[in-house]
From Swiss-Prot:
Composition skew (Polar residues), residue ranges: 1-13
Annotated family: Belongs to the cytochrome c family.
UniProt-annotated stretches for the region Disordered: 1-20
One MF annotation (Gene Ontology) recorded for this entry: iron ion binding
Pfam families attached to this UniProt entry: Cytochrome_CBB3
Topology versus the membrane: Peripheral membrane protein
Presence of keyword Transport: yes
Known role: Natural electron acceptor for a formate dehydrogenase.
UniProt cross-references to InterPro entries, sorted A to Z: Cyt_c-like_dom, Cyt_c-like_dom_sf, Cyt_c_BACSU-c550-type, Cytochrome_c550/c551-like
Entry comment on modification after translation: Is a lipoprotein in vivo. Binds 1 heme c group covalently per subunit.
Keywords: Cell membrane, Electron transport, Heme, Iron, Lipoprotein, Membrane, Metal-binding, Transport
Chain residues that bind heme c: C32, C35, H36
Name this protein carries in UniProt: Cytochrome c-553
């Protein structure tokens, strides 16, 4: 027998048709802070640290998907956009 165990199993974190939970905060760190600021209190784009006080989750999702003002749409899509909208809607 050989001494090398070269198994073909790779753990990708997802299996089958399951949707892995999206880390909304990580998406925000990757896609939002460059314009909205590290603490989301605004930079070249407005503050979104209290987005939930001004917008519903549905409104936030619409802005993420379609853009508003100087923000282009589609910076986050699908499950990422939905997770970020839900996360921001809790910020009040």
């Amino acid at each position: 027998g050989g001494g090398n165990d070269t198994s073909n199993e790779t753990d990708t974190g997802t299996s089958g048709g399951e949707t892995a939970a999206v880390d909304a905060e990580a998406v925000v760190q990757q896609k939002c802070i460059s314009c909205h600021g590290g603490d989301l209190t605004g930079a070249s784009a407005p503050a979104i640290d209290k987005a939930g006080a001004n917008y519903s989750e549905e409104e936030i999702l619409d802005i993420i998907l379609n853009g508003q003002g100087g923000m282009p749409g589609g910076i986050a899509k699908g499950a990422e956009a939905e997770a970020v909208a839900a996360w921001l809607a809790e910020k009040k």
